[in-house]
């Protein structure tokens, strides 16, 4: 083996070289193309050009191998071209119009009328003060059918209530009075789902003294909305009451009867029944009417057909551009506008299996006809009837296939050419397999829809990615196969020309190869360090000017490293220089056997690294950048496109309003009704109204009227008038005393009266003790006062003393005037008294029918002459 390794060929693979040192013999490194790409170095030596292009940053390791000559111990052969399978889109797509249905979770809403009488029995206690409620009993009783007919015709209701409790019949009268007809008046407080009408505002009564038990009967008629959910076995109202009977219950039916927990006598069906609208007074058209008598109320509603009123499915979306993609075991309905894809079985679904789904064909046909008329009537024709498929998640898809006019004409011509028309494909009904979205019942199947359509959006995204990736992989496989076949042909030819390069490329490492007929002998190569290689810049043979080398020449030596693959028998030759030439693809050839006669105008390019070396006249000239030489590519372009952007659109199957209305009872309506019920009365002050014992006197008046006839009625009226006056006075006093401000005012008045009484008492006592001083203050000096000195006047320097009797005269004059005033006051008082006495006497005579005498004309009081004279003065 060592002897075989001595016969070696040297292959040098230089990718991105490292810097090489050079000596006087022309040892050089590899030129970095970044430094010499745009520079013409001119006519310089090969070693100088190589040395000036030393790279700064080696990228690919330089590896040089010495290969032994293959002997045939290891042989290889090339495979034959394969047949390439062309990947085609095997999916079958059909365009059309789709209408998607979902489960109808909304309750069935209808109008009902509630009839009942609200009975309130109140026991109160009062003792000339505010009344106190000691007991209260409230109940609701139903109204019988005959009175309901009167209510719906005339709008009046009786104040009497007859009801059955504890196996006994009871009667109640409003205000404890005789039965009478009262009009139904609207309640001012109402909501969008309820309207109420009633007959009275008074619910509690009392009297001023003692206990009183009274009864009020309020006839109530309410217009309400009722709700019922599938399977429609009961319904609820805004009042919070639930009725355990189906809204579609009827006695006259040939099929199974609907749910009801009531006896038959409680349910009535009336044909051609007319109802009066209590708000507008209009009579509605006659309809079949149902009445149900409950323990607390009677309820009425219009009879309805179940199949015409409700549907278990509702239309969700309309898709004008839908694509049905056929896979091996399923259909995928792609809704691009909605970014969703629904998968289903390949067999159509029979909608006759569904319970209460008669509305689906009608709605689907109307929607598809409208879309086709707006968008496709001039460009497409319909292909077959509407088909229904049960999609994943509980969605029913109504699909109408479409075909363009050109394609339809082509099919028609082909059918006529074959002398027959295409038969419509028989519709295969869906198998009886069970799905998670289909529930069976005694009356039929029912579709249940998932509350989220996220899975459909993910399915759409997956189908888009799957289609794109499958197309990409198919193109890759086809291109790869064709490329391999083309390369095989080239390699079969290359093995004849240069088996070393071919086998090195195939094995992925430098090898030596030799053609042995139709097979190739291969042997490994030994790596030589790049520091042991020296190149020369002249291609002329020394000693013979007519002969030249066909490729650049070089000198190399083996490595002395212990890791070297060189044989131990040749270690003594590691310092020997071995002559060689630069081969193709940066390979080193052993020996210098490639020669030719020197030619004139010689010009050659040899690959070295990433660039080419230009030789003219067998002498190195310059390095040429590879980009300056036009490249002929044999690369096959791969037909692949990048995924397009896809924005997901949030899809909400059920809106917030739909989810809120899923229950039988609406919490908002119940709360609003309770609040309205508590505040139904128009005047809150009339809730408690005092009776004041009128019932007792009314009974006395009725007794006189019934026993004494007309005289008794007159006497009863007098008694009632007097009693009313007395009761009003007593009630006024009691009300005044019960007022806290009245007590405060009375206290203040008492204090002021006491103060005024004390002042008057003091004045009278002073008047009795000293009348002159009280009446004429200052006229008499008080006791102990010294006499006032006489005043003197000086006139003409003479002193004149005033007479002291002048003061006495003034005092006497004042006293006389005071007496005169007192006399006048006394006369005035006597006259007024006399006039009042005369008036009283005349009134007595008038009542006694006594004739007037002459004495009556005389004055009642004689005045003395001195008084008349004084009065004249």
Curated annotation (Swiss-Prot):
Signal peptide (UniProt feature, chain positions): 1-21
Keyword check for rRNA-binding: no
Gene3D superfamilies for the chain: 1.20.5.1890, 2.30.29.100, 2.30.30.1230, 6.10.250.3280
Disulfide bonds: 67-525, 84-481, 157-219, 311-359, 548-598
One GO term describing the cellular component: membrane
Chain positions of motif Internalization motif: 858-861
Name the record gives this protein: Envelope glycoprotein B
UniProt region (Disordered), positions on chain: 418-447, 781-807
Topology Intravirion: residue spans: 762-873
Residues annotated as glycosylated: 92, 111, 201, 252, 350, 569, 625, 639
Transmembrane segments: 741-761
Acidic residues bias: start-end ranges: 796-807
Family, as annotated: Belongs to the herpesviridae glycoprotein B family.
Chief location category: virion
Keyword Flavoprotein: no
Keywords attached to this entry: Disulfide bond, Glycoprotein, Host cell membrane, Host endosome, Host Golgi apparatus, Host membrane, Host-virus interaction, Membrane, Signal, Transmembrane, Transmembrane helix, Viral attachment to host cell, Viral envelope protein, Virion, Virus entry into host cell
Topology Virion surface: residue spans: 22-740
Post-translational modification: A proteolytic cleavage by host furin generates two subunits that remain linked by disulfide bonds.
Membrane topology per record: Single-pass type I membrane protein
Organism: Infectious laryngotracheitis virus (strain 632) (ILTV)
Region annotated Involved in fusion and/or binding to host membrane, chain positions: 124-130, 206-213
Biological processes per GO annotation: symbiont entry into host cell; virion attachment to host cell
């Amino acid at each position: 083996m060592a002897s075989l390794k001595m016969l070696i060929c040297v292959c040098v693979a230089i990718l991105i070289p490292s810097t090489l040192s050079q000596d006087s013999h022309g040892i050089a490194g590899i030129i970095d193309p970044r430094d010499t790409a745009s520079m013409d170095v001119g006519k310089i030596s090969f070693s100088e050009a190589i040395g000036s292009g030393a790279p700064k940053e080696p990228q690919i390791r330089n590896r040089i191998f010495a290969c032994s000559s293959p002997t045939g111990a290891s042989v290889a052969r090339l495979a034959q071209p394969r047949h390439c399978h062309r990947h085609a889109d095997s999916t079958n797509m059909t365009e059309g119009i789709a209408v998607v249905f979902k489960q109808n979770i909304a309750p069935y809403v209808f109008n009902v009328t509630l009839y009942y009488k609200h009975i309130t029995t109140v026991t109160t206690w009062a003792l000339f003060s505010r009344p106190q409620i000691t007991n209260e009993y409230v109940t609701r009783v139903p109204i019988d059918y005959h009175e309901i007919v009167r209510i719906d015709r005339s709008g009046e209701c009786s104040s009497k209530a007859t009801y059955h409790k504890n196996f006994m019949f009871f009667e109640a009268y409003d205000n404890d009075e005789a039965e009478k007809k009262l009009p139904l008046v609207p309640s001012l407080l109402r909501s969008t789902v309820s309207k109420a009408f009633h007959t009275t505002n008074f619910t509690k009564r009392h009297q001023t003294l003692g206990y009183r038990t009274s009864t009020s009967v309020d006839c109530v008629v309410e217009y309400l909305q009722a709700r019922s959910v599938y399977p429609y076995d009961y319904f609820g109202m805004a009042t919070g009451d639930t009725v355990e009977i189906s809204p579609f219950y009827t006695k006259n039916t040939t099929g199974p009867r609907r749910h009801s927990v009531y006896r038959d006598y409680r349910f009535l069906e009336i044909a051609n029944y007319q109802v009066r609208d209590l708000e507008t007074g209009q009579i509605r058209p006659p309809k079949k009417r149902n009445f149900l008598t409950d323990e607390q109320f009677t309820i009425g509603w219009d009879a309805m057909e179940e199949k015409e009123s409700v549907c278990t499915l509702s239309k969700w979306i309309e898709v004008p551009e839908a694509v049905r993609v056929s896979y091996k075991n399923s259909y995928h309905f792609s809704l691009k506008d909605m970014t969703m894809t629904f998968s289903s079985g390949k067999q159509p679904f029979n909608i006759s299996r569904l319970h209460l789904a008669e509305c689906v064909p009608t709605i689907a046909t109307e929607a598809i006809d409208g879309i086709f008329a707006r968008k496709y009537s001039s460009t497409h024709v319909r292909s077959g009837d509407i088909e229904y498929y049960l999609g994943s998640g509980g969605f029913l898809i109504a699909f109408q296939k479409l075909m363009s006019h050109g394609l339809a004409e082509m099919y028609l011509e082909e059918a006529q050419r074959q002398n027959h028309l295409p038969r419509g494909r028989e519709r295969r009904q869906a198998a009886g397999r069970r799905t998670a979205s289909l529930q069976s019942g005694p009356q039929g199947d029912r579709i249940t829809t998932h509350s989220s359509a996220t899975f459909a959006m993910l399915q759409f995204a997956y189908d888009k990615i799957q289609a794109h990736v499958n197309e990409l992989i198919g193109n890759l496989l086809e291109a790869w196969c064709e490329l391999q076949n083309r390369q095989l042909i080239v390699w079969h030819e290359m093995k004849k020309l240069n088996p070393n390069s071919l086998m090195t490329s195939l094995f992925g490492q430098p090898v030596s190869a030799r053609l042995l007929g139709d097979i190739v002998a291969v042997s490994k190569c030994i790596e030589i360090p790049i520091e042991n290689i020296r190149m020369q810049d002249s291609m002329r043979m020394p000693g013979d000017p007519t002969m030249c080398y066909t490729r650049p020449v070089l000198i190399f030596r083996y490595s002395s490293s212990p890791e070297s693959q060189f044989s131990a028998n040749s270690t003594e030759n590691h310092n020997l220089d071995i002559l060689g030439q630069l081969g193709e693809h940066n390979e080193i050839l052993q020996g210098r056997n490639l020669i030719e006669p020197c030619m004139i105008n010689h010009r050659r390019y040899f690959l070295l690294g990433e660039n080419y070396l230009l030789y003219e006249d067998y002498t190195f000239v310059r390095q040429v950048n590879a980009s300056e030489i036009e490249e002929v590519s044999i690369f096959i372009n791969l037909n692949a496109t990048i995924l397009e952007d896809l924005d997901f659109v949030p899809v909400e199957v059920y809106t917030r309003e739909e989810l809120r209305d899923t229950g039988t009872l609406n919490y908002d309506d119940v709360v609003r009704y309770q609040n309205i019920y508590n505040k139904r009365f128009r005047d809150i002050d009339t809730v408690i109204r005092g009776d004041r014992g009128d019932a007792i006197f009314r009974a006395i008046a009725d007794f006189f009227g019934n026993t004494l006839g007309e005289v008794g009625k007159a006497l009863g009226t007098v008694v009632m008038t007097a009693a009313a006056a007395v009761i009003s006075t007593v009630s006024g006093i009691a009300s005044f005393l019960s007022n806290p401000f009245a007590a405060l005012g009375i206290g203040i008045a008492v204090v002021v009266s006491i103060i005024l009484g004390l002042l008057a008492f003091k004045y009278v006592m002073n008047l009795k003790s000293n009348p002159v001083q009280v009446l004429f203050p200052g006229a008499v000096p008080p006791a102990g006062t010294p006499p006032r000195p006489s005043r003197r006047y000086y006139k003409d320097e003479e002193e004149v003393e005033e007479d002291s009797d002048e003061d006495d005269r003034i005092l006497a004059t004042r006293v006389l005037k005071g007496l005169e005033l007192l006399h006048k006051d006394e006369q005035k008082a006597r006259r007024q008294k006399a006039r009042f006495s005369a008036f009283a006497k005349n009134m007595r005579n008038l009542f006694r029918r006594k004739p007037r005498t002459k004495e009556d004309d005389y004055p009642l009081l004689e005045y003395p002459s001195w008084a008349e004279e004084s009065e004249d003065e």
